[in-house]
């Protein structure tokens, strides 16, 4: 794939990521009043399901799509998830590869419904890590805007 093609693909994936990040931010705001200590009734709220699903989708788009396409565009050899995250850290897109691995593990728990039994903890972790995802999305957007063809 040529560089202009990979840049176009990256920009398309980045638009999807930014759209999902916007939905995630709105869901975070809508969940602000939910108190997980009050019992499972609040956790059965559709807002919680929408929020955790959007968190998982945003993490997936960032890690599995956009960051991997950025590597492809910059002619990096495909590698493991750790390789992708370490390169993103070196570029200044993420603060820490370790943090993004935790986010990716949380995403996997949500996607494979391992989170059902621990919904309160999952919900709180999603709230905790959402600013990190939103920040990484913005930094990737900034980084991509300075890429050569």
Regions found by a protein language model. Give the residues of each.
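Solvent-exposed interaction patches of small proteins and small membrane subunits
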Residues: 1-149
């Amino acid at each position: 794939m040529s560089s202009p093609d990979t840049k176009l693909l990256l920009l398309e994936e980045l638009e999807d990521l930014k759209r999902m990040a916007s939905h995630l931010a709105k869901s975070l705001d809508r969940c602000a009043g939910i108190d997980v200590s009050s019992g499972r009734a609040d956790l059965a709220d559709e807002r919680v399901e929408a929020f955790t699903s959007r968190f998982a989708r945003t993490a997936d788009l960032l890690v599995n799509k956009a960051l991997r396409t950025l590597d492809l565009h910059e002619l990096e050899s495909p590698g493991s998830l750790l390789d992708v995250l370490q390169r993103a850290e070196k570029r200044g897109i993420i603060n820490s590869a370790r943090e993004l691995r935790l986010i990716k593990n949380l995403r996997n728990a949500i996607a494979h419904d391992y989170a059902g039994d621990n919904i309160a903890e999952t919900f709180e972790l999603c709230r905790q890590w959402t600013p990190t995802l939103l920040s990484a999305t913005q930094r990737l957007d900034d980084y991509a805007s300075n890429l050569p063809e």
